[in-house]
Amino acid sequence: QLARLKGVEEAVDKFYNTGMYRASLEYGFTLFSKPSDFLEGLIHYCHSHGGAKLSLQHSYAMMLGFLLESGAQWERAEHVVKLDCLTFDPKGRLPDGVQARPAKEEKQAFLREFQGKVQRVRAEYFPYDQSVRIFVYDTTDPITREAFCRVLHKQ
């Protein structure tokens, strides 16, 4: 029982307290009867696939793998992991299997609109909800370190 609680604590510290996996966790929690069951399974998955000391990019890959192993729908799992990854990683390296879909026209329009005010911008198409999200890494939340994000819905 103590080892189980230690595993949940480790998962809470790594994945929940950082806030960097918010969308993935919200979706993952729906796949289990209790959030603690999800977190326990996640940390067990991490340990059995190379350990819990993970780089940011590798931790997003682990999250994706665990979501899929837990019965997640591929399109939705890809969506939430990609959203979390691009919200918090200005380098924008996506986990293996997650396809980058740059939205060049929307990025150029955004840069024209905010000419000289922003430089580090990424516009990405998200097929799950048919949206383009523009991430501005020049402007991050001082507490959460979350990039500013504007959502544009495709018609």
Identify the function of each model-found stretch.
Residues 5:
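Conserved, mostly hydrophobic/aromatic
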